[in-house]
Amino acid sequence: MAVGNYDITYFTEVESKKVNWLWYPYIPYGKLTILQGDPGDGKTTFILSLIATLSNGEHLPFSETKVSGISIYQNAEDDISDTIKPRLERHKANCEQICFIDSKDTPLFMDNDNIEKAIKDTGAKLLVLDPIQSFIGSNVDMNRANSIRPLMTKLKDTAQKTGCAIVLVGHLNKNNSGKANYRGLGSIDISAASRSVLLIGKDPSNPQN
């Protein structure tokens, strides 16, 4: 129903849909997921293991589901040739199913249209930005909601339009006494824009695992 310069939509006009999951109930398709943890607690190791599993079409952890597909993995902290690829090879990944966006001399930020284009061109089921702070841009203050929100909205729209599962890897802050939702670096809007927030940490009863 048109009213002035906007429309009114009643919920009776909206078709209910189920969430589709890449990995139930942790990583949904077409939405954002945050994966957080302290440095050294295994965030990248976990992500590379998951990507390797997808590349080979094997059973996902704690699941009877097998999913195969292309993953786009963007890592701004480690070298591709001497760190990332050797780690994927140790996980016995099929590297023909794993790629990254080479943006040449142009920094790849979360609002870059090349992200959506790369997902569509490859048919990727999963895209990972690791770590999130490396992809927000130098003029964006990730601690300010009005600064980070447009980037999160853009990336959220990209996930929805392409149906790709997008995972943002982030570090935790040093506030050990705070609630888990407030332990992530940056504005709470980062978590609020995400459908799923995952926390990786060491088992207190077995710190070696």
Where are these regions (language model features)?
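Conserved inter-motif catalytic segment of the P-loop NTP-binding fold
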Residues: F11, K18, L22-Y24, P28, ...
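Detector for small/aliphatic-rich hydrophobic stretches
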Residues: M1-K17
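Short glycine-biased active-site loop of nucleotidyltransferases that positions the nucleotide triphosphate
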Residues: S63-E64, D189
